[in-house]
Amino acid sequence: MLHAVNGSRFTVAVSLLLGPLMTAPVSASTMATLRPQALQCLQAGQDAACRSALLVAETLQRRAAARNAFPCQTLLLGLQADLIMQQLGEGRGDQAVADVGATSRGCAGL
């Protein structure tokens, strides 16, 4: 479970949004798995795709951190923020979609 920093509303919001996902099983968590789910979320606003993409992105960003692949981890954290904002109805549109491609390129081989 994510740990909240005192006074951080964003951390609390992320904990509430991701908390239920932390117990869901994740099969092959790869960028190839994440990309179509993230695009479905960002382009079509499909809530199930958003939840699934968040779970895969969380697994991948932890893997990136464990490998000291910090630029990739940063891209994945940004993508997670885009997915959460989409769920909240405040998505960044075309820029968020473009960021999926940037994340795929920046995390190739993860």
Predicted features and spans:
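Classic N-terminal secretory signal peptides
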Residues: 1-28
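Post-signal/leader-peptide non-cytosolic segments of secretory proteins
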Residues: 27-110
